[in-house]
Regions:
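Condensing-enzyme catalytic core mediating Claisen C-C bond formation in acyl metabolism
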Residues: 5-9, 33-36, 213-289, 297-298, ...
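Conserved beta-ketoacyl condensing-enzyme motif
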Residues: 8, 24-25, 29-161, 190-199, ...
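Glycine-/small-residue-rich "gating" segment that lines the acyl/pantetheine channel
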Residues: 123-130, 171, 175, 191-247, ...
Length: 412
């Protein structure tokens, strides 16, 4: 069966840099920092006091007040991003409802809701928790609510693969279209886990930065790095079969050409030595897209700001790209947004598509002290206009989940 070409026709995002695509991308290009003091709970007694929060988000711009009370924050963020992406695409979702699917990831779903309802149960009895507790909390509900809101009756799933989930969602959607199952997919990721239990759990495993200065907390590839900064938000893309998009005169941002996914099968949190799983994953994505390593100009790296991730990912890039690795603009936008966990891959796919459109690599901010183990071109502190034909986006998750996407500049 002939494989169909897949393009991006709609983008939407809500993240620590902005509540829509335009504001977020302007901030990313300018190297703004979206990290600040935690405001969603009193973190004064916590070692970690910083996060990448979404600012001034009004759920009633998405749903009415009554409906908002039935949804967890990660679902509301996903709905906002999806609404922007679908509007941006110009799709007639009612006319094509049965042909449009949804794949949207969340790593931990409604964790803050679980905490809130457990407290309520302890105080009033467990049978007094909200009747909406379970549907609010489960990770698939953001995907489901997008499908319900827009009447989308194609395949609807939720990859729960930790920090690789958003990229798995986009990649799985790409393959669904390429292989002829649906002509259109709404895909990406969403997360909102900035809560006492979320921050406490990641702090306990020594994964989070405990820096007090927002400009010295999320430090991907820098020798000073000491952990990631929790972020929240959602990134959603509309993917579409090329001829379907052309037939309706859709605007095209970029083309998705390759996807790789695999597992380290090594450890539940630590990456495989030398980035072995990431090496294979990037090779799978390049082979899937029939793209040579030398063709890649830009990588939106996983780049969390943990010691092991950044050194292993750098080693993996060296192994895959050889002498060409030093010519690639390798960027961690997590330096600006923090780590959105299951939402990261969606937001970073949005940024990668825009980088290709605008021929501009956003910076890795806060970069001051080079690490001998991290010796690539990280576009330090100031973004760069550059010619780019192909770009790659990496996501590496707890459990050894690896996912990689390859995008191509749209020449139409």
């Amino acid at each position: 069966m002939e494989k169909r070409r897949v393009v991006i026709t709609g983008l939407g995002t809500v993240n620590p840099l902005g509540n829509n695509v335009s504001a977020s991308w302007d901030a990313a290009m300018a190297g703004k920092c979206g990290i600040g003091p935690i405001t969603q709970f009193d973190a004064s007694e916590f070692k970690c006091k910083l996060a990448g929060e979404v600012k001034n988000f009004d759920p009633e711009t998405v749903v009415d007040k009554k409906e908002a009370r039935k949804m967890a924050r990660f679902t509301l963020l996903a709905l906002a991003a999806a609404a922007e992406a679908i509007a941006d695409s110009g799709l007639d979702t009612e006319a094509e409802a049965r042909q449009i699917g949804v794949i949207l990831s969340s790593g931990i779903g409604g964790l803050p809701t679980i905490e809130e309802q457990h407290t309520r149960g302890e105080e009033k009895g467990m049978e007094k928790v909200s009747p909406y507790f379970v549907p609010m909390s489960i990770a698939n509900m953001a995907a489901a609510q997008i499908a319900i809101r827009f009447g989308l009756k194609g395949m609807c799933t939720c990859p729960v693969t930790a920090c690789a989930g958003g990229t798995n969602a986009v990649g799985d959607a790409f393959h669904r279209i390429r292989d002829g199952y649906e002509p259109v997919m709404v895909c990406g990721g969403a997360e909102s886990g900035i809560s006492p239990l979320g921050i406490g759990g990641f702090t306990s495993m020594k994964a989070l930065s405990t820096a007090s200065d927002p400009d010295a907390a999320s430090l991907p590839f820098d020798a000073r790095r000491g952990g990631f900064v929790m972020g929240e938000g959602s990134g959603v893309l509309v993917l579409e079969e090329l001829e379907h998009a052309k037939a309706r005169g859709a605007h095209i941002y970029a083309e998705v050409v390759g996807y790789g996914a695999n597992c380290d099968a090594y450890h539940f949190t630590a990456p495989a030595p030398g980035g072995a799983g990431a090496i294979d994953c990037m090779k799978l994505a390049l082979a899937d897209g029939q793209v040579t390593p030398e063709a890649i100009d830009h990588i939106n790296a996983h780049g969390t700001g943990t010691h092991m991730n950044d050194s292993c990912e750098t080693a993996a890039i060296h192994a895959v790209f050889g002498a060409h690795a030093g010519d690639i603009a390798v960027v961690s936008t997590k330096s600006m947004t923090g780590h959105l966990l299951g939402g990261a891959g969606g937001v970073e796919a949005v940024f990668t598509a825009l980088a290709l459109r605008d021929q501009f690599a956003p910076p890795t901010i806060h970069y001051e002290q080079p690490d001998p183990e991290c010796d690539l071109d990280y576009v330090p502190n100031t973004g760069r206009s550059m010619k780019m034909e192909y770009a790659l986006s990496n996501s590496l998750g707890f459990g050894g989940h690896n996912a990689c996407l390859v995008f191509r500049k749209w020449e139409g």
